[in-house]
C-alpha cells in the first residue's frame, strides 16, 4: 500500500558469546536470507522489497550452498524465488569481499551503503584507508560505469520509488 521497502537489520546481542558487529549482525543477515529461501513470502507479497545489509552476511560466499538448498527444498532457482525482491548493501569492509559481492550477486540487487559510525572505526594498516570507506571499495571494484551508477544511484531509485519521485520533483 505504501510502496516502502524494509531493511532487515538486527540490533545488539545480549549474549556475550556473540560479538554484536563481528558475529551477530552477519549471522542474522545470513539467517534472514535462508529463511527467505525456505519460505514463500514473496508468493504472498510479490511486491515486497527487502534490503539485507552487510553484503548479505555470508550469502555471497556460500551462494552455491544456498542454490543447492533451494533445490533440495523444491524451491525455484534463487533468481526467481528471492532476487526479484531482495537487495544487498555494500557495507563490506574489504576489497576482496566487496568484489565477491559484485561477482556473485547481480548488480541490480546491490545498493550502495555507507556508514555514519561503522563497525570498525580504524584505519586499515594494509591500505592506509578507513575500513568503512565503502565508496572507495565500490569505485575500485572495476565495474563498468553503468553498473557502478546502478549501484550508487539507480538501484536505490528502483527500490525506493518514493525517493525517486521526490528527487525527480527536485530536478535530480
What are these regions (language model features)?
Residues 88, 99-100, 105-111, 117-172:
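Mid-to-C-terminal alpha-helical segments outside catalytic/metal-binding sites
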Residues 1-111, 169-171:
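Catalytic pocket-lining loop regions of alpha/beta-barrel enzymes
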Amino acid at each position: 500500500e505504501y510502496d516502502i521497502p524494509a531493511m532487515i537489520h538486527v540490533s545488539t546481542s545480549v549474549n556475550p558469546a556473540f560479538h554484536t558487529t563481528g558475529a551477530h549482525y552477519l549471522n542474522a543477515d545470513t539467517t534472514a536470507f535462508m529463511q527467505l529461501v525456505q519460505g514463500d513470502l514473496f508468493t504472498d507479497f510479490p511486491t515486497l522489497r527487502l534490503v539485507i545489509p552487510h553484503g548479505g552476511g555470508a550469502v555471497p560466499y556460500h551462494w552455491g550452498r544456498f542454490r543447492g538448498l533451494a533445490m533440495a527444498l523444491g524451491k525455484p532457482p534463487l533468481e526467481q524465488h528471492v532476487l526479484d525482491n531482495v537487495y544487498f548493501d555494500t557495507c563490506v569492509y574489504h576489497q576482496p569481499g566487496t568484489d565477491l559481492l559484485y561477482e556473485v550477486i547481480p548488480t541490480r540487487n546491490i545498493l550502495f551503503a555507507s556508514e555514519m559510525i561503522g563497525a570498525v572505526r580504524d584505519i586499515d594498516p594494509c591500505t592506509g584507508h578507513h575500513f568503512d570507506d565503502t565508496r572507495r571499495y565500490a569505485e575500485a571494484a572495476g565495474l563498468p560505469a553503468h553498473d557502478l551508477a546502478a549501484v550508487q544511484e539507480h538501484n536505490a531509485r528502483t527500490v525506493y520509488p518514493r525517493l525517486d519521485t521526490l528527487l525527480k520533483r527536485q530536478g535530480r
